[in-house]
Amino acid sequence: AATPLALSSDAFGWRTPFVGVAIVTALIGIGYFLGVRDHPDSTDKQAKPEPIRKVIGGLADVIRSPGLAPIFAMHLIAYASMLTVLGLWAAPYLHDVHGMDSVARGNVMFVMAAAQVFGVLAYGRLEPILGSKKRTVITGGLGTVLVMAILALWPSPPLWAAAGLLVLHCLIASYGIIIVAQGRGLFSDHLAGRGVTTVNLAQVTGCFVLPIMTGALIGAFPEINGQVPESAYRATFACIGICVVLGLVAYTKSPKT
């Protein structure tokens, strides 16, 4: 994605890169099918799947787990706040407000994506320093709110500042992995798979709800000369920041682990 996609789209049109990605994805899927075993050597190959009644009962136990609700609420917005900016609004913002072409936008987004990956690794190191998963998540959430507030309140920032803030946002907002780890700690081993899946359901839900919300907000602003005005993007950054604040308020009731 990002720079490679922008370069290939300029050279071949947008369809060819997507066909290429589809082929690579298919090859990876075939490799996974051929190379991954259902039963590693350390597992019981004779184990039978649970009956549906036990599966549903286990899911009910997961939903009733103390401490799940605040973790679910925070995970609803944590990853979505990053992905909505990186995957949806960063490129239009850089084009409409700062006049960047597709390759230049791709370069910024490439660095944003790299920052997100680095952030995931960095949060694993940061958690022991801060002393708890809860403190780490709150730190990341407050940092996200701060970056969104700057982008929302700063009219016409210079390009270097806008791009830097977008990269910083992806770096700071990559604390979702800590929420997943905290959620895993709520469940016994036999419920671990269903428990983590339930926690990640919040991430998936947020990643389609927040883009819809921000898209409706952007659409409420009339275009000027065929472009979305800066005020629409600033309102969107404010909306994302407010959503993170609401998630943090709910998350304060989570267990300290």
Feature map (PLM): residue ranges:
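C-terminal ends and interior cores of transmembrane alpha-helices
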Residues: 142-156
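A late C-terminal transmembrane helix in Major Facilitator Superfamily
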Residues: 186-223
